[in-house]
Design a protein with these regions (language model features):
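Flexible glycine/proline-rich, aromatic-decorated loop/lid segments
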Residues: 125-127, 132, 345-353, 489, ...
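Active-site mouth of glycoside hydrolases
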Residues: 12, 32, 36, 40, ...
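Secreted/periplasmic carbohydrate-active enzymes, especially glycoside hydrolases
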Residues: 1-111, 116, 120-121, 168-169, ...
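Substrate-binding clefts and catalytic carboxylate motifs of secreted carbohydrate-active enzymes
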Residues: 170, 193-197, 204-511, 523-527
């Protein structure tokens, strides 16, 4: 025996796996010698089929539109750590927000993440890397490292995915500008061939940035091409002098919609046609402007919006529904992340004041923040995807009343789902109502601010006076019949700390986590958005405090101390089990507030 055995099993009429019904089977293997069991291994897997063509993307024969979220590899306050519980929580909340697919931008997904996607039902576009021959940042994977390791690393990624029914696409790269030149095109061909040889079941794709490729074809570029950056005294370039991906994002913000326009030019098509011909599904980054025309120019091409702006979801989704060869849309991003600091952060002049001038550490562009809180835009997404008819309300923070924020391409609002702004009575703010009805009405304590027609499932009320009480949004159809309504209430009474653990039992494996949501609430249990204080968390017993933080972009505080200031009345503590059974006692305290306690149990 050479250490490998192949066994063929037949499962009659298997229950098929998909994102709505994630049916899994368990395979157990045992190793014996002379009748004695030496070892055993178990793995979960699922049965499903996928097929794609210009008529659509099919899972188990059913056409499936991909409601996608680009997701980076970090886990917010935990940093770049992957825990089973962290990944399961992320997938669970992404599903709650309406997503049915994630793109692991721009690194291969961890086993823990894929296991969670298998269990909970989430399609995955697993992405290999962010660069091939051209550097985007100092000390990245490009050039020598890539050339030496890409075959081994790509092989490892694809073999890792073999038993995961959640993985439907293997992406071999992101925004590779050298696709415009023969060297990059040949690499694309080789990588696509290898990916298909290793796993012919899954589609091969790549996130193509048409504008970057068009520039590279003309001898220019954003990143490390020879004509970029500054030369040193010897006439050569160093990575410290070259533009980085942060520079590209800054440029995109300044250019606004120009990138979509550049993508629509004939030069962009010419620069990318060869490389895209090697892909099963063409990933378009910020190129929805090409969807309709490429159905005519390239009638055999299947397209996915591999990276898009969240604010463009309505327009993009209409195109997805209209053109069957466009199989889905992946917004940047579904979940906020550490790095690319301030990419989507709405900036105010008050950020320069003492105490508010700390560096921004998060991207700020996720429709779910780094602590896992769903922002108001997620309700808009669900309305666009026709998953609900309940309206949503987004209130521009009254803590910045009178200030004009500098918005980003990636996030054009920092609205909060709150009508609790103590100390700002009488101040005016902008309120956005998200609704699928033709008409909406906004009321504060029964006083109507009028009915408005919706545009792209939104209606904006620019000057709403804050008065404590109840704010209500009502969605009507075109003849004035009420479809649905939603309300938010002001916090009342004395402030207290409220702790909400997401589970109470952990295993003694030193890996299990419990997320404890911390809110400053009034007597009616509603969060107070203006009463931010430093919260101290002390953990004793059979566990420890792994992280404590908030979603504030410019916090100036560490996630790994036991004190952190709330943001809009919220913070998040992550408790980690030890390797012994017992009780975990969690105490939260803040100046002037009564201590609060919660007890968890480690069972084993």
């Amino acid at each position: 025996m050479n250490g490998q055995a192949n066994v063929h099993l037949c499962v009659s009429q298997p229950r098929l796996w998909d994102a709505e019904n994630p049916e899994l089977y368990r395979c157990s293997a045992y190793l014996y010698k002379d009748g004695e069991q030496l070892d055993q291994s178990e793995d979960l897997f699922g049965f499903r089929t996928i097929k794609w063509n210009v008529k659509g993307f099919y899972v188990n024969g059913k056409e499936t539109l991909l409601r996608g979220a680009c997701v980076h590899h970090d886990n917010g306050v935990l940093g770049a750590c992957s825990f089973e519980d962290a990944e399961e929580r992320r997938v669970r909340l992404l599903k709650k927000a309406g997503f049915n697919s994630i793109r692991s931008a721009h690194n291969p997904a961890s086993k823990a993440l894929l296991d969670a996607c298998d269990r909970l039902g989430m399609y995955v576009m697993d992405e290999f890397c962010d660069n091939w021959l051209v550097h985007k940042n100092p000390y990245d994977y490009a050039e020598q490292e890539f050339c030496q390791w890409w075959e081994q690393d790509l092989t490892a990624m694809i073999k890792k995915n073999h038993n995961h029914p959640s993985v439907i696409m293997n992406s071999i790269g992101n925004e590779i500008s050298e696709l415009a030149i023969p060297e990059g095109q040949e690499l694309c061909r080789k990588m696509a061939v290898l990916a298909r040889e290793l796993d012919p079941d899954k589609a091969v794709t790549l996130g193509v940035n048409m504008m970057l490729c068009s520039m590279a074809a003309k001898g220019g570029g954003i990143y490390g091409e020879k004509k970029d950056g500054k030369e040193n005294k010897n006439g050569s370039q160093t990575m410290d002098n070259l533009p980085t991906s942060a520079f590209f994002n800054f440029l995109m913000n300044k250019m606004g919609g120009i990138i979509e326009g550049a993508a629509a030019k004939p030069a962009a098509d010419k620069a990318t046609e060869v490389a895209i011909s090697y892909l099963d599904i063409a990933g378009y980054n910020y190129a929805a402007s090409r969807y309709e025309m490429d159905g005519k120019l390239h009638p055999d091409r299947v397209i996915v919006g591999s990276e898009t702006l969240p604010k463009n979801l309505y327009k993009n989704w209409q195109l997805v529904k209209t053109f069957p060869y466009v199989i889905g849309d992946y917004m940047w991003t579904g979940w906020d992340y550490l790095g690319e600091s301030g990419l989507g952060t709405v900036r105010y002049k008050s950020f320069k004041k003492p105490g508010e001038d700390a560096p921004i550490i998060s991207g700020g562009c996720g429709v779910i923040d780094i602590c896992g809180k769903l922002r108001p835009e997620t309700q808009w997404n669900r309305l666009v995807w026709e998953l609900t008819d309940i309206p949503g309300i987004g209130v521009e923070p009254l803590t910045h009343a009178g200030e004009i924020g500098s918005v980003s391409m990636w996030r054009d609002t920092d609205a909060v789902a709150s009508w609790s702004w103590e100390g700002y009575e009488g101040k005016k703010t902008k309120v956005t109502v998200y609704a699928s009805g033709a008409i909406v009405e906004l009321l504060v304590n029964g006083k109507s601010y009028g009915k408005k027609k919706t545009k792209e499932y939104k209606a904006v009320y620019p000057k709403v006076t804050y008065v404590p009480g109840v704010i209500t949004a009502i969605s009507y159809d075109s003849v004035g019949k009420e479809i649905s309504r939603t309300s938010m209430t002001t916090a009342e009474g004395r402030t207290r700390i409220h702790l909400t653990p997401e589970k109470h039992a952990l295993r003694p494996n030193s890996q299990d986590l419990c997320y404890v949501n911390i809110d400053l609430v009034g007597g009616n249990g509603v969060t107070k958005s203006t009463e931010d204080v430093p919260i101290t968390v002390v953990v004793s017993g059979a566990g420890s405090l792994q992280a404590l933080g908030s979603a504030k972009p410019n916090m100036g505080e560490c996630f790994f101390t036991n004190t952190h200031t709330t943001y809009y009345g919220k913070a998040l503590a992550v408790i980690r089990a030890g390797n012994l059974s017992g009780k975990i006692n969690v105490k939260a305290s803040a100046p002037g507030l009564e201590d609060q306690f919660v007890e968890l149990e480690v069972l084993g």
